[in-house]
């Protein structure tokens, strides 16, 4: 695995790893080392496998009270600065100048890589039939060869993630990439479940709604709007009842960051050793 990645299940309780302490590539925010480089470098970091997460403010605000989500972020191998709100608050509090690396920017770079586009190299975990149909149609228009066997329809997971059927499929097919497009807060826990229980380590990309902004499954977000930290506004305008309350509640992240800054909120037990394969541990 690329040395820029954090240590995953070998990390300390504050989510540090091989990249920790290097301010050229990481910042420790809320006790988690966030990668602050560019999209191409982030995708390169995942070449050897691992778990990538794209934490957004609506889920990050629960970091102090959602132990499962907190554990998933702690044990991720790469965390990117998708949350514009988190980046703005951090730069204000710390007089820093870190840049945002959005999930959309990461996905555009990832989807341009030949090894992701190779037939059979990627398993796509989709949130439901309607989303899957739109996403697959868009992928095929972009030149991806996606057959039905390449798509897994995620069930409605409970707080305790368990999906032995998915483990069996991945164990048999062994794709290099697993792209998870379900909702934030769930996808990270699913990614950690797979990382701990699969007999090999694929690159697990928890990209959430990023593909939906490209496929039309959700509102299209222009690249200029994404770069200007305005993606949330487009989502709110497209579906106010759904997204306005979500982003309004995300303001709680400000208080969390003022209180904890670079410290991990909540008590977290030491990392557990990966469980043997086959022993199990809301959609967007």
Feature-to-residue mapping (PLM):
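A short helix->loop->beta-strand "cap" motif at the edges of active sites that frequently abuts
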Residues: 49, 119, 199-203
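Short Gly/Thr/Asp-enriched flexible loops that form oxyanion-binding sites at enzyme active sites
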Residues: 136, 188-197
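A transmembrane-helix-recognition feature enriched in membrane-embedded lipid enzymes
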Residues: 87-88, 220-273
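Proline-aspartate-enriched helix->loop->beta-strand connector
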Residues: 170, 174-184
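Short glycine-rich anion-binding loops that position phosphate/pyrophosphate groups of nucleotides
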Residues: 57-60, 85, 182-187, 210-211
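Conserved beta-alpha
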Residues: 87-169, 173-174
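N-terminal nucleotide/polyanion-binding subdomain common to many enzyme families
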Residues: 1-8, 14-107
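Short, flexible loop segments at boundaries between secondary-structure elements
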Residues: 153-158, 201-238
